[in-house]
């Protein structure tokens, strides 16, 4: 259980305005949420929120979004997505889940970071084509866990 007042699901992606890439990234987010112990319905909320955010991104031509964060704010009782531009400035904040869902999510989700697979020394993945091209790093007491949670290693 998470005792902190604010928890974030950080999805760090270099996003193409490409429907296939957005769809694959949404599937990867859903997979990550399930791997973190979130219910299937809530994981779909995450994926749907990403899809909505991706549509906003595609309507803002000329601006490269480098970071998409899903912020669970217990103080406000809300879950929202925040988009950040290449220069780090905030572009937009959109609702991510229904108000009733944030309590259950905040009990289950620790900080997750998504990065392109090549950021961790693997082959350069280029655009996001499938969930396999992303590596989820779940930090929990010095253990680095894979998306399925089946293998872990000490840092």
Q: Where are the language model's segments positioned?
A:
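Bergerat-fold GHKL ATPase/HATPase_c domain
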Residues: 1-48, 150-155
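Conserved beta-strand-loop-beta-strand hairpin that lines the nucleotide-binding pocket
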Residues: 1-12, 56-155
């Amino acid at each position: 259980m998470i005792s902190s007042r604010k928890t974030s699901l950080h999805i760090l992606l270099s996003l193409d305005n490409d429907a296939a890439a957005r769809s694959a990234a949404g599937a990867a987010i859903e997979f990550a949420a399930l791997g973190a112990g979130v219910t299937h319905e809530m994981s779909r909320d995450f994926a749907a929120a990403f899809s909505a955010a991706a549509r906003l991104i595609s309507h803002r031509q000329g601006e490269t979004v480098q970071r998409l964060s899903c912020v669970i704010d217990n103080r406000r009782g809300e879950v929202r997505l925040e988009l950040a531009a290449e220069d780090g400035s905030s572009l937009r904040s959109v609702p991510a889940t229904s108000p009733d869902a944030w309590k259950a999510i905040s009990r289950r989700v620790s900080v997750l970071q998504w990065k392109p697979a090549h950021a961790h020394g693997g082959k350069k993945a280029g655009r996001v084509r499938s969930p396999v091209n992303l590596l989820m790093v779940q930090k929990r007491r010095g253990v680095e866990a894979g998306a399925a949670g089946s293998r872990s290693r000490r840092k």
